[in-house]
Amino acid sequence: VGSVYIVGASTVLGLCISIPIVFFVNIYLKKDSKLANLTRLSFDVLYGIPSIVYGAFAFTIMIFFGLRTSLLGGIIVITLLIIPIFVRSMDEVARQLPKELLDATYSLGATRLEAIKVAIRQIAPGIATATLLSVGRAIGDAAGVMFTAGFTDSIPTSLNQPAATLPLSIFFQLSSPTPEVRERAYAAALLLTIIVLILSIIGRMITYRFSKNKIK
């Protein structure tokens, strides 16, 4: 349940932050302008930072403000972790948008907001792929949430309570001397594999559906 809460909330937040950044870089700015290239470089650097660094940094901030490990801390760290994945994946697709498509849209008197709607229809497969990659990275991450979300056997009922994720459950239960506990770890590992497989299938279906509307 903790994985569902953290991954679901961080994915929504990541999309809400990443999509405006991608459209700002590719529509409001020139694609190859200095500011656009600097923005891409910044997210490339963030993409290469290990998740444990995000977790350690967030943990330091939490200690400074006297905060405890919680569901909210896990959501924030995973959101920061997947935003570079969202931006890089969607930016690669957005840069391939035909310039003639946007020119034709503006020539018909469309506003930038209407041009963005047209662009969204074209890069929808990229958004689906970015979401798939981000969810896969988020649901399998253990290092970041180990510092921030904590671990508990109970279901969190508020953002201030600790939350257990599947990877952390597998990690702690595999080290148990009790066979029954280790069996639960194997079951959790199987469940995690099935979830990733289902997400992969859904992502491919969404990509195929929206690719029919893409202008080549």
Region spans (language model):
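Periplasmic/extracellular loop-to-transmembrane helix junction in inner-membrane transport proteins
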Residues: V1-V12, D32, F172-E183
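Generic hydrophobic transmembrane alpha-helix motif, especially the helices
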Residues: D44-T79
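C-terminal transmembrane helix and the adjacent membrane-cytosol boundary/short C-terminal tail
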Residues: D91, R95, K117, F172-K216
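Transmembrane alpha-helices
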Residues: R112-T148
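Transmembrane-helix boundary motif in ABC transporter permease subunits
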Residues: A9-F43, G203-K212
